[in-house]
Amino acid sequence: MKKTTISYSILTHNETDSLLKLIEFLVKHKDEEDEIVILDDYSDNPKTKEILDVMCSMHNITFDQRHLLKDYAGQKNTLTRMCKNDYIVNIDADEIPHKSLMKNLKPILESNPTIDLYWVPRVNTVDGITQEHINKWGWNVN
């Protein structure tokens, strides 16, 4: 039986520390047959460029650049076409999947082969958040 494979897809633009943490996490927790795919909106932050150059070459990450030009759907569609595996997990550059998700994702996918789409709830954790931030960004805390 063929192994289930996953493409972890990430859109980026000038992310730095969070992107590095995400890549390091995925490299550590993904299976060997899985891939990391990054589409960058021509980041102009030198630190972001360095992270992408180093991490993509060190870890055989599929990487390309495309101008967003207010076309988020086109950006996501381009990223999707870059992915080669059975399933795609879209991750924001400032998110880290839970370790239990990484461990249990393939068994869940393999035991439900007729399901094409999964919704994964997430918990946002923001260091140093204040009520002012919550009000400014229109977040709900519940």
Which residues fall in each region the model found?
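A generic secondary-structure signal
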Residues: 25-29, 54, 78, 82, ...
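Short, acidic/glycine-rich phosphate-metal binding loop used to engage nucleotide
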Residues: 65-72
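Catalytic-site signature of metal-activated, phosphate-bearing donor transferases
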Residues: 73-80, 98-142
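N-proximal low-complexity "stem/linker" segments adjacent to membrane-targeting elements
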Residues: 1-28
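The conserved acidic donor/metal-binding loop of glycosyltransferases
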Residues: 92-96
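Acidic donor-binding segment of Leloir-type glycosyltransferases
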Residues: 23-65
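Short aromatic/hydrophobic "clamp" motif used to bind/position activated sugar donors
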Residues: 88
